[in-house]
From Swiss-Prot:
<dbReference type="GO" id="GO:0030474">
    <property type="term" value="P:spindle pole body duplication"/>
</dbReference>
<keyword id="KW-1133">Transmembrane helix</keyword>
<feature type="transmembrane region" description="Helical">
    <location>
        <begin position="296"/>
        <end position="315"/>
    </location>
</feature>
<dbReference type="InterPro" id="IPR031433">
    <property type="entry name" value="Mps2"/>
</dbReference>
<dbReference type="Pfam" id="PF17060">
    <property type="entry name" value="MPS2"/>
</dbReference>
<comment type="function">
    <text>Component of the spindle pole body (SPB) required for insertion of the nascent SPB into the nuclear envelope and for the proper execution of spindle pole body (SPB) duplication.</text>
</comment>
<keyword id="KW-0812">Transmembrane</keyword>
<keyword id="KW-0963">Cytoplasm</keyword>
<dbReference type="GO" id="GO:0071988">
    <property type="term" value="P:protein localization to spindle pole body"/>
</dbReference>
<comment type="similarity">
    <text>Belongs to the MPS2 family.</text>
</comment>
<dbReference type="GO" id="GO:0005816">
    <property type="term" value="C:spindle pole body"/>
</dbReference>
<keyword id="KW-0206">Cytoskeleton</keyword>
<dbReference type="GO" id="GO:0031965">
    <property type="term" value="C:nuclear membrane"/>
</dbReference>
<feature type="coiled-coil region">
    <location>
        <begin position="117"/>
        <end position="232"/>
    </location>
</feature>
<protein>
    <recommendedName>
        <fullName>Monopolar spindle protein 2</fullName>
    </recommendedName>
</protein>
<keyword id="KW-0175">Coiled coil</keyword>
<keyword id="KW-0472">Membrane</keyword>
């Protein structure tokens, strides 16, 4: 059984236990309960040390907070996987794959099939006896009903004779018109109910999108908080402007290193996934000549992407490091025509000035205010999405 069927089987087993009324949805307060039931199924027959967790402790805390904050948010069965991915940060399929590697779901499905066959065999004899008993009761009741039917028929004839001229028979035009009116009313109410359900579903999806946006703003807030803590730890009273600027560039370099580390981990995981299963790129029955056009472009594209990212980050870190070093050890030669206080720090250093003006003339992408604090702050905010 592949991973997709594992995930579908696990969701189909747990969902009816929580959605007891078969409404097709559960409330967000029951979302952690679904995950805990899934973990109980996956850990049946396992020792305490071998028990697997579908989500981490951090993910479990996120689910509890989501269930308490959005208590009556409707979670539909078809939206469960997308919501699980958005909250935990891991796809539901991958989470099930990491916990069901020992074939526990295969054994569970086989045992359910065997139990169903045995229950069917043991209950067939009892059902036959129950059917025979019910048939005998039906015969007795039928004989009694015949007598009741004759009495009811006689009473109906008497009532029909006593009814006035204004009475409407069952098949009269007035009765038919009333029936059609009621049917139209029922149809209208059903359409209105379907429309309201669709509106509620759409609002639920909008709320899900807003939840994702809140997560993005939370990431930006955490970045600003790290920046504040960094500056708070490196503050120095009455320090020169060059040292303050160097501290700012030092934080930029530390953030770039952190991003390089994260991207290196992602690239390493992608490389492991590509190299772990060579059979996916070279299917059996196909020669090496036929597999070459599919294998070579994929590796080439991955290498080009990795090289471009590393080259860009190395160039950016180098430029910012040169700026920081120039701010600390810039030339202090006396000013000639322009006062030193009016020159930028990179204009005061001969080597950096030549290098930066050379790249400006070559690419024509720098402006005259590239080294000023306002432009640096704007570029810095744009880089980190603040």
């Amino acid at each position: 059984m592949d991973t997709e069927r594992h995930a579908t089987l696990l969701l189909d087993l747990v969902w009816p236990e929580v959605d007891e009324k078969a409404q097709g949805f559960i409330y967000a307060k029951d979302f952690p309960l679904v995950v805990s039931r899934m973990e109980e199924i996956l850990n049946r027959g396992k020792l305490e040390r071998d028990r697997a967790q579908l989500v981490s402790e951090t993910g479990r805390e996120i689910l509890r907070k989501f269930g308490s904050d959005q208590e009556f948010f409707k979670v539909y069965k078809e939206d469960f996987r997308e919501l699980f991915d958005g909250l935990v940060g891991t796809s539901f399929k991958s989470a099930v794959k990491s916990c069901a590697g020992d074939g526990v779901l295969d054994r569970l499905q086989d045992s359910q099939a065997v139990d169903g066959i045995q229950d069917e065999k043991t209950s067939s004899h009892a059902l036959q006896e129950e059917v025979m008993r019910l048939r005998e009761q039906v015969r007795v009741l039928s004989s009694k009903n015949d007598e009741k039917d004759r009495e009811i028929t006689a009473r109906d004839e008497i009532i029909a004779d006593l009814q006035g001229k204004d009475a409407s028979p069952a098949g009269s035009p007035r009765s038919l018109q009333r029936m059609r009116t009621l049917q139209a009313r029922v149809t209208s109410l059903e359409d209105e109910l379907s429309f309201r359900d669709e509106v509620i579903r759409e609002k639920d999806r909008e709320l899900l999108n807003l939840t994702k946006r809140v997560g993005e703003f939370k990431d930006k807030y955490q970045f600003l908080e790290r920046e504040f803590q960094f500056y708070k730890g490196h503050r120095e009273q009455k320090s020169p402007d060059s040292i303050k600027e160097a501290t700012r560039h030092e934080f930029i370099i530390s953030e770039l290193r952190r991003k390089i580390t994260e991207q290196s981990e992602i690239i390493g995981q992608m490389r492991m996934q590509v190299e772990a299963k060579p059979g996916a790129l070279h299917p059996q029955g196909i020669g090496s000549t036929a597999g070459l056009p599919l294998n070579l472009p994929l590796r080439l594209v991955l290498r080009l992407i990795i090289g471009a990212i590393l080259a860009y980050l190395a160039f950016d870190i180098g430029i910012r490091s040169l700026k920081a070093v120039g701010g600390l050890f810039g030339s202090s030669s006396p000013a000639t025509l322009t006062p030193k206080s009016e020159l930028s720090w990179w204009e005061q250093n001969t080597l950096l000035s030549k290098l930066l003006w050379f790249f400006k003339d070559l690419f024509d992408t720098y402006n005259l205010d590239a080294g000023r604090d306002e432009v640096v702050s704007a570029n810095y905010d744009k880089l980190f999405g603040v």
